Amino acid sequence: MFVSDLRKEFFDVIVTERVLLLVAPDVDALCACKILQALFQCDHVQYTLVPVSGWQELETLFLEHKEQFRYFVLINCGANIDLLETLQPQEEAIFYICDTHRPIDVVNIYNDSQVKLLIRQDDDLEIPAYDDIFNDDEEDGEDSGNESDGAEPSGKRRRFDEAAVERRIERRRQRREWEARRREIIFDYEQYEYHGTSSAMMMFELAWIMSKDSNDMLWWAIVGLTDQWVQDRITQMKYVTDVGTLQRHVSRHNHRNEDEENSLSIDCMRIAFEYDLRLSLYQHWSLYESICNSCYTSATLKLWSLQGQKKLQEFLADMGMPLKQVKQKFNSMDISLKENLREMLEESANKFGMKDVRVQTFSVQFGFKNKFLASDIVFAVLSLLENTERDEKGTDNFIKALDSLSRSNLDKLHTGLEMGKKLLCAIQQTVASCICTNLILSQGPFLYCYLMEGTPDVKMFSNPISLCLLCKYLLKSFVCSTKNKRCKLLPLVLAAPLDAEKGTVIMVGIPPEAESSDKKNFFGRAFEKAAESTSSRTLHNHFDMSIIELRTEDRSKFLDALISLLS
């Protein structure tokens, strides 16, 4: 059931209760979690926070905690499966779900008592009507008219029996037709996976309704939305619309005419709307390295080729940027160059086919020195979340990533930024390697690439977010590099080694690369059907259905089934 009043139907209900907060490991979920934690602290709500890596862990953790809690809040998990069927909770358990995953399971939508959806209904949900998918009429086993006291003449009784049989046959035919139509409706509804409004934005909306929103909460909402943009999960139109919504809040919280004392305080926090460059981490790197390791510039200039490197030199010369300036840290660049950088870069980018080199975004300044773009925070947090440098537990990474979102933990954020640079370098090197060695193969209805065991940085890509980023960057770069028009329109399936000892791979599928794409992904259902038809040993454990784990020896039969399914 959808919650129409976030305050009355959600917050006011749990404010005096103990709550179990189950949070998925993604940046938007962490931002939503920070906002909710801040609201809980305001009203002294008792809660326990538990990170949840996938469906299996959700079931295990629920079993562990179900006796101690009645109220459960799930962030970015739980909406797209039948939650009550999966968890088998007691009747008094109540689940509040704030999740961007679509489509929402129909049982969750139409359950009025135990499942409460903290999800915006104006998202393009296309929910099937209740009567089309649920049949409340119980089919009578026997027709009541069948019962006879034997007093009627046998001829009349026979005619009565025939009429009852015909009615029963007609009812069964209608039932079969209804069930066939229901299967069709459910298939159409569940066919594509996509994402709705950021959970961090939903939690900020709650804070705003309660008049408890702060600049910190607003910044977390901005980072949550930017995470969706960085990961290409929402359409450009949806992103621009949501940026507009947040921009109004930014104006409200960050007045230009604030008193001088506050605006120059060492503890101050100022958020500003920016029309900034699509260059990852450029303010914390050198401009040269950022251009080389940002997906947009690297793919458009084809930097994996000698011709691309030559084009890069021409591009920098056209900008009038001395190589010495471009290759040193951004902070050390000549001030006059820094001030005019956006305009200079945009003018030259247009000549080199990069017409969308600037994007609507936000920046934050903490005190005098620390300035960050929203995308900087996204890369830092996701790199901390999926850190493979030390063999730490996922929970440790989760806590560090969550801490890095607080402005009192800037040291952790800077650590995340350094790790983000390493991730971006690893992605670009892997993209260059895959394109130069022709590892991307056309399998008919889709492109396929497998990262071999022993590939540099392959361990990084055993994590879902990093693998998805690589997949998106790889497809964009391949589309820019190939001359085959048909291949430009194909989706991509990417697989990487997961656990050598267990002999498993992790696989992700993404829709075709197109600016106008609706970002709807059909691989989730396709993976399920391919696994079913071949009895492949797969694990559908990720909250994103288009990511699966698979036994290495089942890979070829699974792919064959996927090809025939999508052909």
UniProtKB/Swiss-Prot annotation:
GO terms for cellular component: CMG complex; DNA replication preinitiation complex; nucleoplasm. Its main location: nucleus. It holds the Pfam family CDC45. It is found in: Nucleus; Chromosome. Keywords: Cell cycle, Chromosome, DNA replication, Nucleus. It comes from the Eukaryota. One of its GO terms (biological process) is mitotic DNA replication preinitiation complex assembly. InterPro entries: CDC45 (IPR003874). One of its GO terms (molecular function) is DNA replication origin binding. The keyword Nucleus applies. Residues 133-160 are annotated as: Disordered. Residues 133-150 have a biased composition (Acidic residues). Belongs to the CDC45 family. Interacts with topbp1. Component of the CMG helicase complex, composed of the mcm2-7 complex, the GINS complex and cdc45. PANTHER family: CDC45-RELATED PROTEIN, CELL DIVISION CONTROL PROTEIN 45 HOMOLOG. Required for initiation of chromosomal DNA replication. Binds to chromatin in a mutually dependent manner with the GINS DNA replication complex. This is Cell division control protein 45 homolog. It comes from Xenopus laevis (African clawed frog).
